[in-house]
Amino acid sequence: MEGLWTSMVLVIVGWLLGVLSPAMIEIIRRQRDYPLLQQSLRADLAELRLLLALSAIGLKTAQGLLDRELLEWQRDVLSSHRGKSDMAKMLERTNTMLSYSDADLSALAAFEAQNKVATGHGLKKFSAPTISAMIPTLWQLPRGLQVELLEINQALSHLNEEVEYAQYYFRLTFENLASANHAIAKANLTSSYMNIAGMATRLVEKIDHVSHL
């Protein structure tokens, strides 16, 4: 009888090991790969944050909205950047502009608005390759990080929809439209640019508050 129980126990233990081994292997693999994944996500978000901020600043500058507050935000973004892009020279220029008097800064804002090259044709959709690639497997990440990355991905999708509108309105400004319709297209383009600037700014703030990396 004792031999029978021993055999049954061994069978059960063998079955459990067969069932649990893949799960245990997966857990070990995740623990091994997670630091590399964290590093990749940090780099991806850092570059996205920088691009979003500079795009928002550029769009506002083109509308004559360059001021000390905007430059201070630019300085903070550049000085806290931890990505691969070297922003030392831009940070130096930003600090130089912050040393200007209010009158000189106002003159600079007017000059930049008048001479800013139209940005519509160069305004491209934003992307976060690592996040996009991970969407199907986000369940493997800590719950809090899942939520934060999904929120960023959703906000990025909405932002890119607005970029499409801006690209459309930009193309319209070059078409042979009646004067009134051309004015409407330009107004819509400006409105779209400001929407993008606002959405990009909020997304930078969202990235800054990612707390699970």
Language model features: what each stretch is:
Residues 1-31:
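Membrane-embedded hydrophobic alpha-helical segments
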Residues 28-49:
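Juxtamembrane membrane-water interface segments immediately C-terminal to a transmembrane helix
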Residues 43, 47-213:
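Interfacial alpha-helical end/capping and short helix-turn segments at domain and membrane boundaries
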